[in-house]
A protein has these predicted regions:
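Structural beta-strand/beta-sheet cores of well-ordered domains, especially the beta-sheet scaffolds
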Residues: 2, 14, 25, 37, ...
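Short, surface-exposed secondary-structure edge patches
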Residues: 5-10, 42-48, 62, 70, ...
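N-terminal accessory targeting/assembly segments
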Residues: 1-90
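Short beta-alpha junctions and helix-cap segments that line functional grooves
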Residues: 13-15, 26-28, 41, 56-60, ...
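A residue-level detector for short acidic-glycine micro-motifs
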Residues: 17, 31, 41-43, 75, ...
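P-loop NTPase nucleotide-binding/switch module
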Residues: 84-127, 132-139, 144-146, 156-216, ...
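P-loop NTPase catalytic core
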Residues: 206-211, 215-519
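Short, surface-exposed secondary-structure boundary micro-motifs
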Residues: 7, 21, 59-60, 78, ...
Length: 519
């Protein structure tokens, strides 16, 4: 953290650049006390001297939005990593996230004289066979009139494709590029309904039907390796009914981030037969990067997801791990000498997590189209402590909990999701019960609860057998135990590399469930 003395107005979260040794280091204002401003630098401060000058930009940390982001690898500040050379990132090196020279075929969707509001669809371009909308500026107030719109043709992202006239008569030129502060949620929608959607993973669906984009997923991996987390993430990314996939590697080890960079481009999209990377964006910040950049990465990922949601697309956002993000918040809070909460996390950690998760969801746009963000957050508590503040507050917000267990992974029972510790609060909602009755049958929730009871009973009997031996428990106990094992093998275990078993339609899941119940 660096303390600056300013001679003018400064805003909270404003971005500034500090000059040192010929480099300009990006920093963010995190606290203002009179003429003293405390900033958190996004890069190493080695060599920074007293008296160095700082230049304030007048805006918050922003992302640049537009065509050309798909299949890109970014860092937390949206620098294009593919444009950077060397093994390690150089300090003070920033790259533009989009390709200014690429040509896009623009197709208008409005005509002169039409009335539009912020984020209204003005036209469309295709990127990797994915139709993307060119929208009115998100920052526009009120209603504007389309003064001119360019005809169908080829344009660059900086070319003016439309001119809007606002209510005061001012002209607003529109290009394919937009900027948006990452810590501000996009609220350019009419409402947030609550739909549900069936997933194709048996281990999750048969315990509870997963909510679609519009709710929040939650994965909890134990802080151990080789528990099948990566394969499960790949399976969800490939099989999800999502148009766009965004991966945020927040504060993970460098070798885990390298796995993402090397393995994701090789995955084949089962829906199209093309590479999954063509509709994927990867945002990476390793654990050795400054805490401010680690915090920024999850906000950057969410802002990109909101941008695509405004186009009426389904976005899958996976963040690994939100615990590192929370630890970055703790470090900055401690440096500012704020009153610490449990485990030295900020006192408002609950509100911060709630506000961030609240940006995800299913929305109805102004033109009655729908878009959605499904957020899968990975939490890695130290020592596997489920009672630590980040895990507790995330569970309250997400209401859906996957407990990845090392013991199941050691037994090669994949996906290694513990069926006893995992749960979903959604099955308690009346609207969820109505959805199940309408789309599956009236007995589904009862059957799922019956299976979970059998699994719980089987676990208790397994502990008794381990203590007393096979001859120390009645025969009927063995029957209950092996029935629970049958449920585990047939329903909860799934081969992510098998063409048939990797994704299971709801009809097949229902048939398997009924067959097991009758045994």
């Amino acid at each position: 953290m660096v303390t600056l003395v300013v001679d003018g107005p400064v805003a909270q979260n404003e971005i500034c650049y500090i000059s040192t040794g010929g480099d300009k280091l990006m920093a963010e204002v995190i606290k203002v006390v009179g003429a003293n401003v405390y900033v958190q630098v996004f890069e190493s401060t080695r060599g920074l001297k007293v008296g160095a000058e700082a230049e304030f930009t007048g805006h918050m940390l922003e992302v640049t939005l537009g065509p050309g982001m798909l299949s890109k690898n970014y860092d937390g500040l949206q620098n294009d990593l593919d444009k950077m050379d060397g093994v390690f990132l150089k300090r003070g090196q920033y790259t533009y996230p989009l390709d200014k020279e690429r040509i896009w075929h623009f197709v208008p969707m409005v005509k002169a004289g039409d009335k539009v509001v912020a984020s209204a669809w003005l036209g469309q371009v295709d990127e990797n066979f994915q139709p993307l909308k060119i929208m009115a500026p998100f920052t526009m107030n009120g209603t504007a009139t389309v003064k001119t719109i360019m005809p169908e043709g080829d344009y660059k992202i900086e070319d003016t494709i439309a001119i809007l006239t606002d209510e005061e008569g001012n002209d607003i030129p529109v290009t394919m590029i937009q900027k948006w502060p990452v810590k501000r949620a996009m609220t350019n929608y009419k409402e947030k309904p609550r739909p549900f959607k069936i997933a194709g993973n048996r281990c999750t669906c048969n315990r509870y039907v997963e909510p679609d984009c519009g709710r929040w997923y939650r994965i909890y991996p134990r802080p151990l390796r080789y528990n099948g987390k990566t394969v499960l993430q790949h399976a969800i990314s490939k099989q999800a009914e999502a148009d766009i996939v965004i991966i945020a590697a927040c504060g993970e080890r460098a070798n885990e981030v390298v796995e993402i960079f090397t393995e994701f481009p090789e995955l084949v999209d089962p829906h199209t037969g093309r590479k999954l990377m063509e509709r994927t964006i990867i945002i990476a910040n390793t654990s050795n990067m400054p805490v401010a950049a680690r915090e920024a990465s999850v906000y950057t990922a969410m802002s990109l997801a909101e941008y695509y949601r405004s186009m009426g697309l389904k976005v899958l956002l996976m963040a690994d791990s939100t615990s590192r993000w929370a630890q970055a918040l703790r470090e900055m809070s401690n440096r500012m000498e704020e009153l610490p909460g449990p485990d030295a996390f900020p006192m408002d950690i609950s509100a911060i997590i709630s506000n961030f998760y609240g940006r995800a969801g299913y929305v109805k746009l102004g033109n009655d189209e729908t878009g959605s963000i499904t957020f899968i957050g990975t939490v890695s508590p130290a020592g596997g402590n489920l009672k630590e503040p980040v895990t507790e507050n995330t569970k309250k917000v997400a209401r859906c909990f996957y407990a990845l267990e090392q013991d199941r992974a050691d037994k090669k029972r994949y996906p290694a999701v513990n069926p006893i510790d995992s749960y979903s609060k959604y099955i308690e909602y009346p609207e969820f019960e109505e959805y199940i009755k309408e789309h599956i049958n009236d007995e589904w929730i009862g059957k799922v609860n019956e299976l979970k009871t059998r699994l719980q009973r089987g676990k208790e009997i397994a502990e008794q057998i381990n203590i007393l031996g096979d001859d120390g428990v009645p025969v009927e106990y063995h029957v209950i135990f092996w029935k629970s094992e049958l449920i585990d093998f047939v329903i909860l275990q799934q081969d992510a590399f098998d063409e048939v078993d990797s994704v299971t339609p709801m009809e097949r899941q229902e048939a398997i469930l009924n067959m097991i119940i009758d045994i």
